[in-house]
Amino acid sequence: MTNYLGITIDYERDNRLSNQADTLMRDYYMLDHESSPQEAFARASVAYCGGDLDLGQRIYDYASKGWFMFASPVLSNAPDGDGGNRGLPISCFLTYVGDNLDSLIDHNGEVAWLSVKGGGVGGHWGDVRGISDKAPGPIPFMKVVDSQMTAYKQGKTRKGSYAAYLDVSHPDIEEFISFKVPTGGDINRKCFNLFNAVNVTDDFMESVINDTEWQLKDPNTGTARNTVKARELWQRILEARFRTGSPYINFIDTARRHLPEAQRKLGLSINGSNLCNEIHLATSEERTAVCCLSSVNLERYDEWRASGMVGDLIRFLDNVLQYFIDYAPEELGKAVYSAYRERSVGLGAMGFHGYLQSKGIAWESWQAASENYKLFKDIKDQSTEATYQLAVERGECPDGVGYGVRNMHLLAIAPNANSSILCGCSASIEPRISNCYVHRTRAGSHTVRNPYLEEALESYGQNTKKVWASIIESEGSVQHLEFLSQAEKDAFKTAFELDQTWVVEHAAKRQEFICQGQSVNVFFPSGTDKAFVNQVHLKAWKEGLKGLYYLRTTSGVTAEKVGTKVDRNALKDFVDDEVCMSCQG
């Protein structure tokens, strides 16, 4: 045990980190003078403890034990008291674009500053008038942002990231859906460096179900510019998702219904989402919403559930917000204003599939559904108690005056791929894509095996190179291993082997407790029946999800290639470097 920055750290806890996690820490999160990941954990814990070293000690202990992990910017940009400017602890933002030249120009400037500061950005373009003889429509302006993403680097090699949101009723929606597809259309209007997302309304989904026509209306005048078959437009959206992974689908009416009453009374509204579709906060000409994230490790739930950690993390994230408010540059004034007014945080989770597998529970089971409900109800209850207590101690946030809360929102589940590596658990609330794969990042290549499967194989005396080679040859599957019981085969099914209605089922049931949203991916082998793909997407809307993130396919993927992100962008393969670093909650 050693005293460091006013708290006690344990260098022996480095042994809890995998080689991959240790490499990631040293290459991306530790400062030059830091000799151990423990010092980096301590730096972040103390930097945002608000002067309460007892809280800093507890936060350090939680992180160093792998019970939770800081979002990437919270950890990498935490100051160490030497007066140096390490950047901001928040790097995910939601913006709004108005239908006037001043707003368009202002948006370009804001995106530039957000990108320079390491931010990933989601932008809503639905109010920008469509293409006509007097207006170019929103896509040429998106093309400007597309170029900005290559101009403003974040770190040594990573470019900026931006997701554009457009309403399904917008006159330019058909071109927008395909602006990442490399073939067809004007290449000068393609936006390969952006991600696209469609705001899908309840009326549109009803029109799809009833097979009626759908009007595309100019947001400036409200008049119909074109009429299309709703089902044909929906089919184009799903086909683009199957080909490129996007557009994300944002069920905007569902999100708006769940905006807190206090904010609805203030006339606020949700217009879109963020880069990873888990943040659902109000935006406007005056507000750029911010995502203040970190994630608990569900695989260690039995260790931390009665520790008080969840309450401490809400307090900690409130401190992180305050640091952002105090130190963000004036160019981020809209983001600072939003953070000050609503103080929303997004405590997330990772390790859900690993938690189930550690208990031998199959994903496709009502036992899994019961565990899912229990976990997220507990996290929400503890978070709510914490924000009530903070309101008493520190005061209500301005948006929540009279409601007794310090933070308007508490929970949001981000992709958190890097955080899951550091904690040695499965990513986010996703099913594992493979039981064995080579994880390639700029930090190097690492073979990753499912530790719970490894335990099962060991119990059979089958933890051998030959067996693991057969798993790799089977694209990460264990269904061919005859010595495993059917219950074990069910527990170790991979994402592409699962019935995706269960992915949606679990997401829908936990959404009751997630005041913001979830980065929910769906997984379909190539050749999946289109009717089933449609069925899963319809279920997501009917069951009350706020959105769907990527549609992932098996095209070109093997157990060797599978990582934490299997996206298709302009038909090129990705490595895990291109996972949204801004949402590493």
Locate the predicted segments by residue.
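Extended catalytic cores of very large enzyme megasubunits
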Residues: 1-585
